[in-house]
Amino acid sequence: MSHPLTFLGIESSCDDTAAAVVRAAERAEILSSVVDGQAALHAPFGGVVPEIAARAHAERLDLCVERALQEAGLGLGDLDGIAVTAGPGLIGGVLSGVMLAKGLAAGTGLPLVGVNHLAGHALTPRLTDALAFPYLMLLVSGGHCQFLIARGAEAFSRLGGSIDDAPGEAFDKTAKLLGLPQPGGPSVEAEAATGDPRRFAFPRPMLDRPGCDMSFSGLKTALLRARDGIVAEKGGITRQDRADLCAGFQAAVVDVLAEKTRRALAIYAEEQAPVPALAVAGGVAANGPIRAALTRVAEEAGARFLAPPLRLCTDNAAMIAWAGIERFRAGGRDGMDLQARPRWPLDQSAPALIGSGRKGAKA
């Protein structure tokens, strides 16, 4: 049995300031998890404003760490290490977290472990369910969407991903186009519950192409045109129009994710895992219809389906603390030269996705 380890985790890659304490002994235990969201700060702008997010992180990070330690009933001297998100993400927030972690590590002499934010999501099933490698992971969030085969704490193979917008980003933009509050995921899902998903013939992008790559920007454009068509005809949209638009959009996202997951499972089957498993993580994994569809796809393929509790789907520091423990046990640790990285692909060997931009692959 591995020696028990207790780690502090720090997360500040987007618009959630978070700190947590996780202990790994015979089983993993989350001793505390503090998340200070910034939704109210960004709501007037219809999306996350990087400068506002960075300032909020700088103001709140130390308070979150103090609270996480208090709730865990521990002091810095009771820890075995400090894990921090070192990327990818909005660079101002990531830098704030890395600088705080460096200061704590320097002052206490504790090991410092930089964590890839995506690895935090991808390793969450091992925190919650002690899932064995290898497993198939669908990471689906506001900034990322990709299929990964997780083979180890730092060994991931990407099978495909979104070449443009991530689903969470598309949900947020849909909410903004329809005058719904942010974050868009819960708002669109709630509105879609009373809508007719068959009213609008929205496209299912890239289902006519082989492989596991996806695209969601065209779906967002189709919704914009449908909305504008209603406005041109009626002079505005009714609540039912809005519900139908949300239902049609959500159904299209569900169909794309379900079919691409079938393809990814077929590739993953070649791994011959003792217990085939499909895990899903990221904020969009909290969407009920998406979870239900992926559950059915996994059952059809004879795979176990795992999704973390909703509080661990969205950004949190417990997953960062756990990923730090995993990396530390594998021999990974960092010095004071640890750098904040806006882009940091999990699979360094995979070719950049088409939408990666001039600065390189995001994930």
Swiss-Prot record:
Binds 1 Fe(2+) ion per subunit. Its EC number is 2.3.1.234. GO terms for cellular component: cytoplasm. Keywords: Acyltransferase, Cytoplasm, Iron, Metal-binding, Transferase, tRNA processing. It is found in: Cytoplasm. It holds the Pfam family TsaD. GO terms for molecular function: iron ion binding; N(6)-L-threonylcarbamoyladenine synthase activity. It catalyses: L-threonylcarbamoyladenylate + adenosine(37) in tRNA = N(6)-L-threonylcarbamoyladenosine(37) in tRNA + AMP + H(+). Substrate binds at residues 139-143, 172, 185, 287. Belongs to the KAE1 / TsaD family. Required for the formation of a threonylcarbamoyl group on adenosine at position 37 (t(6)A37) in tRNAs that read codons beginning with adenine. Is involved in the transfer of the threonylcarbamoyl moiety of threonylcarbamoyl-AMP (TC-AMP) to the N6 group of A37, together with TsaE and TsaB. TsaD likely plays a direct catalytic role in this reaction. This is tRNA N6-adenosine threonylcarbamoyltransferase.
